Amino acid sequence: MADRLVRATAAGGGIRLVAVSTTETLREAQARHGLSLLTAVMLGRAMSAGLMLASSMKVRHGRVNLRLGSDGPIKGLMVDAGRDGTVRGYVGEPALELDPISDEKGNYGFNFKAAAGTGYLHVMRDDGKGEPFNSTVELVGGAIGEDVASYLLHSEQTPSGVFVGEKINRDGILCSGGLLVQILPKAAEEPALVELIEQRCREIEGFSERLAACNNNLEDLLIDVFPDLDPQPLTDTEATQDVRFKCRCTRERSIGALLLLGRKELSEMLEADGQAELTCHFCNNRYVVEREELIGIIEGLPAAV
């Protein structure tokens, strides 16, 4: 079943809602990068969050980058998400595994804080017009949802609830997705509504179970979570859209990256390896430039480069 994103409003238009499923997207990322369940879950949460942030951009080609920079053993992660529903990403230490931890109810889960360590969440919004908007906030706990909510509050001054989750078993990813709840500016002036939304967000428990139960029907998920706020999917043509893993790397771009190395370094590479090999961080695609082609590239460069 294809992943999708749904935009909606609630409380008479005072609340903005975005729900996204990223199950197939995450499965592809896991297969491409050889991710452990821990790193797959963390990357999946970041991809869901990135897509939900990108969904509010005005231009179709707008993109959002989320980068977790920290001192933890995961060695950071990076997500590039587009308003068009495409997303890609990678993890610094894809095979990382840590012992699970238990909560007060005896349920076991991943130790996101230990994986992430201390550090920062860097967010970049790029609409293709002028300089991208960049902002950085300290990590709250490394589970992604709270970290992105902190960014929205402190950098965009938008009170938000960000819920990301997944269901897994020993065989892999059963479902993955997220939910974004934002109080729009006019509604933020109504204390009773703000208090109601904050209460509803505090009451959301078992988001991952609710996500799995909706079986990719995100409209049902919105009604399940906010039954008394009358969530209404937008009626325009982009109220819903497909979501997929897609990388923008190409062989031509890889050749362009080789040119930046210069004649001397490429000549040393030719002598040592007989070819050049580049691997895309985002999708793990491998591009090989064979000996004859590499010689042609070197001969086309000025000697001083």
UniProtKB/Swiss-Prot annotation:
GO terms for biological process: protein refolding. CDD domains: Hsp33. Keywords: Chaperone, Cytoplasm, Disulfide bond, Redox-active center, Zinc. Coiled coil: none annotated. It is found in: Cytoplasm. InterPro entries: Heat_shock_Hsp33 (IPR000397), Heat_shock_Hsp33_C (IPR016154), Heat_shock_Hsp33_N (IPR016153). The keyword Chaperone applies. It holds the Pfam family HSP33. It comes from the Bacteria. GO terms for cellular component: cytoplasm. Its main location: cytoplasm. One of its GO terms (molecular function) is unfolded protein binding. Disulfide bonds join C247-C249, C280-C283. Redox regulated molecular chaperone. Protects both thermally unfolding and oxidatively damaged proteins from irreversible aggregation. Plays an important role in the bacterial defense system toward oxidative stress. NCBIfam families: PRK00114.1. Belongs to the HSP33 family. This is 33 kDa chaperonin. It comes from Synechococcus sp. (strain CC9902).
